[in-house]
Amino acid sequence: MIKSLVELLLLGQSYIISAIFWINLYMNKNHSFIGSNVALITPMFADGAVDYEALNLLIDFHIDSGTSSIVSVGTTGESATVGVKEHLKIINHTVKYAAKRIPIIAGTGANSTSEAIELTQEAKNLGADACLLVTPYYNKPTQEGLFQHFKLIAESVNIDQILYNVPGRTAVDMSVDITARLAEIPNIIGIKDATGDLSVIEQLVVKCPENFLLLTGDDATAVDFLIAGGHGGISVTANVVPKELQKVYLSAIAGNIELAKNLNSKLESFHKNLFLEANPIPVKWALHKMGKCEKGIRLPLLELSNEFKSIIENDLKEINLLWKLSIM
């Protein structure tokens, strides 16, 4: 094992980390998605129309902040309330504006296998770097049905694909064994696990290939997920504090556990409060208060309830103060 230390200039901060970590990172063909990937909101005007100028500013914000990649039109991007044409228009705009300055992961999951194939093929045609595919929701497929669903998508469209298991939204929980079988398919490169169950990551580390990306989708348990062997996350919190969260994630991945936990302690209440109501309601309000987007959100989702607005606003003030006082 290489024991020498290297100094990495990361987002304007000097970090001393193990050289072996960075060597292993760049040997992983999927290294572009290691660290903090943002589950980007879709900014909207009050009438629900997409605000593409605000979207441009958000893309620049994440490029400047060192975010690993952007997920376009996932759950946080309100994929459930955009039509197919608009869905693809948002992906197209994001890919073109990003212009290879940051990788773009397109949300292309559906509970119809044929629709998921169509969306994934279109996303590839538009130039997305990878696709995020949620487990089919509402129709509750069997475990073998899940395997056949993702297998056919992978065989039909030659683009890197990331599985997405979020049983709290889909009413189906993909087993570790099915994930491990799917991990053997070359263009299925990873999974976003949003179960919040740390026993899952412990099993995935053992059963999946070493270069299979293990990404958390649960901000509240992210640091422990990374310490257990995860490679990064697709984050809601990263919408608001991308630079800070990237520091947390890379510290944890590199094995600097004390630093990661110390940094994350400043964000713990915020992670939880961003789910006071259904995502993306609170995070959109937070970004609105930061001046980064209008208040627009689409029915059946509504603007954040008045009783929670002050909580989010206080979180923003506290995070800003705590990070300014940090010695990092």
Protein language model features and the residues they cover:
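Cationic, low-complexity basic patches in intrinsically disordered or flexible, solvent-exposed regions
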Residues: 4, 8, 14
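Low-complexity, intrinsically disordered or signal/transmembrane-proximal segments
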Residues: 13-15, 26
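Conserved, mostly hydrophobic/aromatic
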Residues: 48, 62, 94, 123, ...
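Active-site beta->alpha loop and helix N-cap motifs at the rims of alpha/beta catalytic domains
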Residues: 30-34, 52-163, 167-170
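Catalytic alpha/beta core domains of metabolic enzymes, predominantly
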Residues: 171-268
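N-terminal amphipathic alpha-helix/helix-capping segment at the start of soluble metabolic enzymes
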Residues: 26-53
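C-terminal alpha-helical cap/extension of soluble enzyme domains
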Residues: 35-41, 65-67, 76, 227, ...
